[in-house]
């Protein structure tokens, strides 16, 4: 059955603009999608849920966000089209330290500190800043085409989430899992807050190793080499003032007779013992280590083992205290004060270092100074060296929470993709330490604890509850804890707090969203925050969320871990390197001057600006073109491999922008060839020839491969399959194969109508197949094309995702087509090798062809002739000698193109001789370079390898040119 194209359909080609311009398309469709509510859950089918990893509320989009969002949106759109009740929920993080730093910098520019304003006014300023800049990143997420349900957008400081944070803190405290203690923490003297281990970066730096003489209390004691002192090496001379022991290895015979004896600590005159501990490396330095439990984590642990006192010498600015704080042993409170050496009081730690070394040299107890490569612990935000400092902090007791989280991964309730990250997670979880959750900031969730004048601590959801629970007198003055919670504490509750969890069992049981969408299906994240966030989410969720049978509920079933986006050279993208790319600059384009200004503005080290400007001008002489959202998204998906590093190459974006153009132009061609013509209303497989059988089979295989790719989180394979099918099979082959059919007066109208239907149907299915990866282009074309075959709808977003049909898979058709493609390819290769040009029709001789193959070729002879640009096909008998020809072999078949009369031998030989001379010269230059031992020794290995590859390519070209010359000379 067929139908005549209506007038509306006759306008189809005009509906698609001549050239593909993504800008207008993108703005139009996102607004429609959002206004019509297509991003909201449908309420039908099985649930599918992803929670967006909350970006910093005052931040802006970077390549990692772009990559992450492209993957999440592809997964969401795929599951929505598969009929799932889909929720992709957005939100932002208050980002304690980062946001407070930004606002403090703004105030500093006006010579105002947060202390000048006071806590309440400062927090008001932060909220103002959040309102001003907080929408930037959500606007940018929209530009990426992200189909998140904006009606459910959350912020970690929303009332509901803040109440959930208090509820969790109070319950963990009631369960004995939150405690307050004086412990050693990473203290950031610039930001004036404790940092977790994960917020400290080890930076390789050039330093020194100072060797000092510590003299024995007993003047009669001697070392094996006759000295009355030990030589102790340290990278931190200033902490000498807080030493409480010198440690040696118990099996170090050099010092066995000294264990238990005392040395006199320089400057202070205090006596400190010599202790034996296996922590000491016998072969490092002198084998003697100074122990400062208050200012070194390893020393703190060693001090606990030996019941050493702890002497804190620094205040929170990392300046020497007037009175050192003395603690008899770890875990106890300050019991005494020791007067500091007067000359050192108030000195910043590095000034104290300089003074101490000078004093040691002047007094003769400096032994030597050696250059030393060290790893300096620096705060990841401030960049300053952190100071191990003894402070009162709040901690989560992790061990009881960690065990269920370990078991959930071991028994498969949570699966890591790729699998390799399971081991990374396990290694960390099995060695996990208690979590310091207090931060000395003002912006964030204030710790729900109150103190009376005597230092008693009361924990509760609010002050009223605290007073009622503890029967406190109304006139008893209470002061709330000044600290806030680590940002990762609130984001650790992200999957359930954002769905409205209250901690009230009755309310939570009636919460549709909580019961429908939790546990969520997949968390998409970079490997760099597995510990920061993923592990903590698992622990917190499993403690508070329970299944109906009371067993712990996981936050998500799968953790899809992707690599970090780096530049084309594999370098980390950073402002200081000047290699950062903004996804929106790739989408919209940016001129060179704006790009230079963007990359050089606000550098920590302004001296880098010139170098960055030069590199930018070299790499992007014309600035960056506008590629559109679909090309950028498709690139991200195509790069989503299982490795830890994702090298982002702008050439890939350019290639996928060309892919968008290819789809656009192919659609226009198809529409122009069907408008005003008859198109079959229903499939007529009995009218299919090899091309239709083949393309329909290949479509099923593509659909099958894409489903498998989504199931295994291999979006790179999904992108590759879609690209190969649409470009290489549909556009390059099937569309070309239809041209001679539709232009042939001998072909029946019925068959032509069916070919037009197949052209449209395969493109329509391809658009649905590609939609999760490139939503805008596919929606725009689908709206015009789908109604032409009775498949229209409000939006492609809710159209059914293509599902492979086994009945349409045809292995024989695929094998036959592969063989035909090989024959056509052989003729094209001969044409190219002999420089015959595309305009000339060639005579072709075929040999070693079976009867069935001959029948197949004769049946599709018009297609073969049209695609290979052949004037005649002649079949040679077995053993028949062909005339002098250029030849190729396809399977068992031989393809010949007789050369006589096709070329001017003399002119062609002259041309080839010039090519030969040119290639020979290039070959010899590289061969000479590689024969130079100096070049091979000094050049980077990659450069040498690249030259070897070039040499091999030139050698191959020489062989081919000579073969062509021999063939032509024989004519």
Curated annotation (Swiss-Prot):
Pfam families: Anticodon_1, tRNA-synt_1, Val_tRNA-synt_C. GO terms for cellular component: cytosol. Its EC number is 6.1.1.9. Keywords: Aminoacyl-tRNA synthetase, ATP-binding, Coiled coil, Cytoplasm, Ligase, Nucleotide-binding, Protein biosynthesis. PANTHER family: VALINE--TRNA LIGASE, CHLOROPLASTIC_MITOCHONDRIAL 2 (PTHR11946:SF93), VALYL-TRNA SYNTHETASES (PTHR11946). Belongs to the class-I aminoacyl-tRNA synthetase family. ValS type 1 subfamily. Catalyzes the attachment of valine to tRNA(Val). As ValRS can inadvertently accommodate and process structurally similar amino acids such as threonine, to avoid such errors, it has a 'posttransfer' editing activity that hydrolyzes mischarged Thr-tRNA(Val) in a tRNA-dependent manner. This is Valine--tRNA ligase. It comes from Acinetobacter baylyi (strain ATCC 33305 / BD413 / ADP1). The lineage of its organism: Bacteria, Pseudomonadati, Pseudomonadota, Gammaproteobacteria, Moraxellales. The gene is valS.
């Amino acid at each position: 059955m067929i139908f005549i194209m209506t007038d509306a359909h006759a306008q189809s080609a005009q509906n698609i603009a001549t050239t593909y311009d993504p800008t207008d398309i993108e703005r139009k469709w996102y607004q429609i999608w959002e206004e019509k509510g297509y991003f909201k859950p449908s309420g039908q089918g099985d649930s599918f849920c992803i929670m967006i990893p909350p970006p910093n509320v005052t931040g802006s989009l970077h390549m990692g966000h772009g990559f992450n969002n492209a993957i999440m949106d592809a997964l969401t759109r795929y599951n929505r089209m598969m009929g799932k009740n889909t929720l992709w929920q957005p939100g932002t993080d208050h980002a304690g330290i980062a946001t407070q730093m930004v606002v403090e910098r703004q105030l500093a520019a006006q010579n105002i500190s947060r202390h000048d304003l006071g806590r309440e006014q400062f927090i008001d300023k932060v909220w103002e800043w959040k309102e001003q800049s907080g929408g930037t990143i959500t606007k940018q997420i929209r530009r990426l085409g992200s189909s998140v349900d904006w009606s459910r957008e959350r912020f970690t400081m929303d009332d509901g989430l803040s109440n959930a944070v208090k509820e969790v803190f109070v319950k963990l405290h009631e369960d004995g899992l939150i405690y307050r203690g004086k412990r050693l923490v990473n203290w950031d003297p610039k930001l004036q807050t404790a940092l977790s281990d994960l917020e400290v970066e080890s930076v390789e730096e050039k330093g020194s190793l100072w060797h000092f003489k510590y003299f024995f209390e007993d003047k009669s004691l001697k070392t094996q080499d006759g000295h009355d002192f030990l030589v102790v090496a340290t990278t931190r001379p200033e902490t000498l003032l807080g030493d409480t022991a010198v440690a040696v290895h118990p099996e170090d015979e050099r010092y066995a007779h000294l264990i238990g004896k005392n040395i006199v600590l320089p400057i202070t005159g205090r006596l400190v013992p010599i202790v034996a501990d296996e922590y000491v490396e016998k072969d490092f330095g002198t084998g003697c280590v100074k122990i400062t439990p208050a200012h070194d984590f390893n020393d703190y642990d060693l001090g606990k083992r030996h019941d050493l006192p702890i002497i804190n010498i620094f205040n929170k600015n990392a300046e020497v205290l007037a009175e050192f704080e003395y603690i008899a042993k770890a875990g106890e409170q300050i019991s005494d004060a020791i007067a500091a050496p007067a000359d050192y009081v108030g000195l910043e730690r590095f000034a104290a270092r300089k003074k101490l070394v000078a004093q040691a040299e002047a007094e003769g107890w400096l032994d030597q100074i050696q250059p030393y490569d060290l790893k300096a612990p620096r705060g990841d935000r401030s960049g300053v060296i952190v100071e191990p400092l003894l402070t009162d902090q709040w901690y989560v007791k992790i061990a009881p929470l960690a065990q269920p989280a370990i078991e959930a991964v071991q028994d498969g309730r949570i699966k890591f993709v790729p699998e390799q990250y399971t081991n990374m997670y396990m290694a960390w979880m099995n060695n996990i330490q208690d979590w310091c959750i207090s931060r000395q900031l003002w912006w964030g969730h204030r710790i729900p604890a109150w103190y009376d004048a005597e230092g008693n601590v009361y924990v509760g959801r609010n002050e009223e509850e605290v007073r009622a629970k503890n029967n406190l007198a109304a006139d008893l003055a209470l002061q709330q804890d000044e600290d806030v919670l680590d940002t990762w504490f609130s984001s650790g509750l992200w999957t359930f707090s954002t769905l409205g969890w209250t901690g009230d069992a009755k309310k939570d049981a009636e919460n549709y969203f909580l019961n429908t969408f939790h546990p969520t299906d997949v968390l998409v994240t970079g490997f760099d925050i597995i510990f920061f966030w993923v592990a903590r989410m698992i622990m917190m969720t499993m403690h508070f969320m329970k299944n109906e049978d009371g067993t712990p509920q996981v936050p998500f079933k799968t953790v899809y871990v992707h690599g970090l986006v780096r530049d084309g050279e594999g370098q980390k993208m950073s402002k200081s390197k000047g290699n950062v790319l903004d996804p929106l600059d790739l989408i919209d384009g940016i001129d060179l001057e704006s790009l230079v200004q963007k990359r050089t503005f606000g550098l920590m080290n302004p001296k880098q600006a010139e170098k960055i400007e030069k590199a930018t001008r070299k790499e992007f002489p014309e600035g960056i073109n506008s590629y559109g959202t679909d090309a950028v998204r498709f690139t991200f998906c195509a790069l989503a491999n299982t490795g830890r590093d994702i090298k982002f190459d702008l050439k890939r974006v350019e290639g996928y922008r060309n892919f968008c153009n290819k789809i656009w132009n192919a659609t226009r061609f198809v529409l122009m060839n069907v408008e005003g013509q008859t198109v079959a209303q229903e499939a007529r497989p009995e009218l299919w020839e090899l091309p239709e059988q083949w393309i329909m089979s290949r479509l099923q295989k593509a659909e099958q491969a894409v489903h498998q790719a989504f199931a295994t989180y291999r979006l790179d394979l999904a992108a590759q399959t879609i690209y190969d099918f649409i470009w290489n099979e549909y556009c390059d082959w099937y569309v070309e194969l239809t041209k001679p059919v539709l232009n042939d007066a001998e072909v029946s109208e019925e068959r032509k109508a069916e070919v037009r239907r197949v052209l449209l149907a395969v493109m329509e299915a391809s658009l649905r197949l590609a939609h999760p990866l490139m939503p805008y282009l596919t929606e725009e074309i689908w709206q015009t094309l789908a109604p032409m075959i009775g498949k229209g709808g409000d939006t492609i977003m809710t159209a059914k995702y293509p599902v492979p049909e086994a009945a349409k898979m045809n292995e024989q058709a695929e094998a036959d087509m592969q063989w035909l493609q090989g024959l056509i390819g052989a003729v094209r290769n001969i044409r190219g090798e002999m420089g015959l040009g595309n305009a000339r029709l060639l005579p072709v001789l075929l040999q070693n062809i079976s009867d069935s193959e001959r029948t197949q070729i004769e049946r599709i002879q018009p297609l073969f002739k049209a695609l290979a640009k052949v004037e005649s096909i002649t079949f040679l008998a077995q053993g028949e000698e062909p005339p002098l020809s250029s030849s190729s072999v396809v399977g068992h078949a031989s393809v010949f193109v007789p050369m006589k009369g096709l070329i001017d031998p003399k002119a062609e030989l002259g041309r080839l001789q010039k090519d030969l001379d040119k290639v020979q010269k290039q070959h010899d230059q590289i061969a000479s370079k590689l024969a130079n031992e100096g070049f091979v020794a000094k050049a980077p290995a990659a450069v040498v390898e690249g030259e070897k590859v070039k040499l091999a390519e030139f050698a191959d070209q020489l062989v081919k040119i000579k073969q062509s010359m021999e063939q032509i000379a024989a004519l």
